Amino acid sequence: MSRRSDLSDKDSQSRKRHWLTDQAVTNEEKEQSPTKRTRKTKSQGLGGLFNTFFGMFVSSNSGEKEKTEVSGEVQVQEDDEIIVEGTTRRVAENKKYMIFLNEDAPVRANAGSEENEVIIEKHVQKNVEIRNDEEKQEVQGDLVLTLSSSPKSPKNLEKSFEVQQDDEEPDVLFEKVVKTPNKQLQEARRFQNELIFLNDNPDTPDDVSVISDSRSKEFISPTPDDSVSRPITPSLSSLSNYTSNNVRDYWRRNSAKKPEVLRRVPVRHQFKHSTSVRKMNTIIDLKKIKNHLSSRDRLLQGVVASGQYEAKAISGIVEKKPKKMQRTSSTDILARAKNKIAELGGSRSNTPSLLSREPSIIIDSEESTSSSYRQHARSNSSESDSYRKLNDILSQINSLGIGSAYRGPQRYQNSYQLSKQKEDKLLEEARIREGHRSQTRGDRLEDVRKRLELQGIAIRPKVEKKKVDDFMALPDAADALVERAWSGGNPNEQFVDAFSIQICKKDLATLSGLHWLNDEIINFYLQLICDRSNGDSKYPKIYAFNTFFYSNIVSKGYASVKRWTRKVDIFAFDIVLVPVHLGMHWCMAVIDMGEKKIEFYDSLYDGNTAVLPALRGYLEAESLDKKKTAMNFSGWTIQQMTDIPRQQNGSDCGVFSCQFGEWASRRTTPRFTQKNMPYYRKRMVYEIVSKKLLATI
């Protein structure tokens, strides 16, 4: 054993045996092995000295001759077959060479079928005679070492060994008994490695990450076993290239937790035909199917070659076929096809484009369908006639070109072109008409104006009014002022004093939330409207009665309010605002002297009929008292307004009435709604405290 270890250190390949080295046997390698018998040298003492001087003399006289050493060049195949190809010339002192009596590969391969066979390999050291072949020396420069093949039994091996040895007995290094043929052992080991590889590395799709679980879809920290630096797991088609050296991964740690990428498939399932076909996104990958089938066949061959199972037991798996797809009855398919052809035949007269369709234009899916039907028809002889008829019907259907991808555009191409041309003509006509209309619009208006002037009707051109923002944003100071007015504190705190009216905190508090407005707020706001008209001439002149005016007229008559206007001529104003209080509801009446109309605004529209007659009687009495003439109401319009904003609760009537008066003072139609009431409440607080209205014309 020490002999083998010393020689193996000089070879880089661990699988080569120690007697296959290409170097000459040195003096250190001459040490006797434990199994080698000691041989006495014939030349000892004076005889040995004489032989030494004689060898030196002969070597000096024969300088032209060269002493050669033959070392065996050995080539090792993948299955460790040992073959002697040839020898090379080298000078050696002892002329002893390493040979072995293994038989060549073809003979040993043929011998693998014998069951009870015993092969004894004897590795000896012997003087070898060199047969010089000039022809081979010129071509290869090598000497051929001829070995006679012997039968495969211990006795034949011993006889061949005795024939080859000379007078001296060869040195037997060691003997090795091989109970099983070498090639069969290698195949059995390779198949065992493949099974180990299948158990350790299940076939997983390449697109699954090693750090994620496809079932839980939760992130899993990678372990050393799942490092991305490791090579990708090879497919089953490349398992035959792996040996025992690269099957096991020694870097793997058993304690490391492995992520469950996919459920492991047992090895026995690899032999099933159903598991060898995998569908990805409903598309069958034929290349993967072939690889799985080839891997399955390779594994079955390995099982048989290893001798673990008999070929008869495995034949049942090979001959097992997949279940046939359940198909509908052929009679039903024929009946449906005939009905479809009848429908298409009846519609062919209405669709002339189908007659001109080439029968060669069909969809690929239909071709594949017909071909699949043909394959099934060939496999099932009992239904061959039915499938032949079905194929004929399908060919007729395909010849019509119903499934053609180009049928639609070609069928409607002419109609599309006609509609496109018609559309282009209409667009061009519309463009010409619009251009002519824009050029002659002024002339036509002038002609109409002249014809109307001849009839006595004048048409005034419309004057574009300036757009006014009726809901402008409040200034920044308004929020602070409103917060101060509506916060807790002394309710008698005075905020403003104008128009002989004092506004305190308790008065401003009526504008918060859904509180009812009191008399001070309404009177003060109406005075702001009058003050704005006095300061700017573009506004109509406004006069406003206080909140007690209408109550006195109704309850006490004209005499109770006669002295209220002794210094004021209400007929000199353009608009007179009359706030109307109906007990628990506020309304607004507007008397427009310039436009001769009396309007009553009620946000609830409860059908009150007493307000308008009372105001008309007041105007008649006031005219007789101040002008000494009767009031002439011819041409006047007295009505209750209906198309006005309506309140949606029972607390905003005071705000509605004030805004009706403000919009009427500008002679504009009110456009606010219930949703604007919170805005108007804050705005009225700011306008009252600042004594200035924000709305303008």
Swiss-Prot record:
Q: Quote the disruption phenotype from the UniProt entry.
A: RNAi-mediated knockdown causes increased presence of smo-1 conjugates during the first embryonic mitotic division.
Q: Which InterPro entries match?
A: Papain-like_cys_pep_sf (IPR038765), Peptidase_C48_C (IPR003653)
Pfam hit, one? Peptidase_C48
A GO molecular function annotation here is: deSUMOylase activity
Q: Where is the composition biased (Basic and acidic residues)?
A: 1-14
This protein's source sits in the domain of life called: Eukaryota
Quick one: where's region Disordered? 1-47, 365-387
Q: Where is the active site?
A: 585, 602, 653
Enzyme Commission identifier(s): 3.4.22.-
Keywords (alphabetical) are:
Hydrolase, Nucleus, Protease, Thiol protease
GO biological process terms held by the UniProt record:
embryo development ending in birth or egg hatching; positive regulation of error-prone translesion synthesis; protein desumoylation; proteolysis; regulation of protein localization
Into which EC class is this enzyme placed? hydrolase
| Any Gene Ontology CC annotation | nuclear envelope
Q: Where is this motif: Nuclear localization signal?
A: 15-19, 462-467
- What are the boundaries of the region Protease? 501-664
Compartment annotation: Nucleus envelope
**Role, per record:** Protease that deconjugates smo-1 from targeted proteins and may catalyze the processing of smo-1 to its mature form.
Name the protein family: Belongs to the peptidase C48 family.
- Supply the name of the protein: Sentrin-specific protease
Instruction: Report the source organism.
Output: Caenorhabditis elegans
Q: Give the encoding gene's name.
A: ulp-1
